[in-house]
Design a protein with these regions (language model features):
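Generic enzyme active-site microenvironment
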Residues: 6, 169-170
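Substrate-recognition element of Asp-dependent hydrolases with the DxDx(T/V) motif
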Residues: 24, 93-124, 180
Length: 187
């Protein structure tokens, strides 16, 4: 019997990729980095979970850890500004959450994004989705290994006190789907 519905990423709740792509480009300009991500380029980079991980992978030796952190922080500031007026949830997600709750399922948000990003998304979606009643929310700070490692899902299962076969995960990238599958969760 299914006991929990685990939402695995921001992209399951709302479409933010374009806002994040623009925020990265703003950060690149602000830090004098001669990069510009068009839509196709940014979509390819989504194969690597985690903004700082993407920058590290793409920058190679060209960017220091401190530069990566600063660029990402500026990106986060620009992203926060773009979310200030709120955002719409993906079509059908509110209805899915309502039906899951009506069926007695516990809802979880199992992500390895930063607590700051979670707070921004929570606020931006607050007119549509109340994340305060989610049974579990994980972040990057809760695990040593980020997705595609299954640690975040294993933690969520532990916090919920359920087995992997009692949950269903919804993810929006192959890497993130791999995390759920690694933890033995249907996705």
């Amino acid at each position: 019997v299914m006991k929990a519905l685990l939402l695995g990423s921001i992209g399951v709740l709302a479409e933010t990729s374009e806002l994040q792509r623009r925020a990265y480009n703003t950060a690149f300009v602000a830090h004098g980095v001669d990069w510009h991500w068009n839509i196709a380029t940014y979509c390819r980079h989504l194969d690597t979970p985690g903004g700082q991980n993407r920058l590290r992978q793409l920058g190679g030796d060209a960017l220091t850890t401190i530069e990566i952190r600063r660029i990402h922080e500026t990106k986060q500031d620009a992203f926060a500004a773009s979310l200030a007026g709120g955002i719409a949830p993906l079509t059908g997600i509110v209805e899915t959450l309502t039906a899951a709750r009506a069926a007695g399922l516990r809802i979880g948000f199992v992500t390895t994004t930063t607590p700051r990003t979670i707070a921004m998304i929570r606020e931006a979606l607050s007119g549509h989705i109340d994340m305060s009643d989610f049974a579990v929310i994980t972040s990057k700070e809760d695990v040593v290994r980020e997705k595609p490692d299954g640690a975040c899902y294993e933690l969520a299962l532990s916090r919920l006190g359920i087995a992997s076969h009692d949950a269903l995960a919804i993810e929006d990238t192959v890497a993130s789907q791999s995390a759920a599958i690694a933890a033995g969760i249907r996705c």
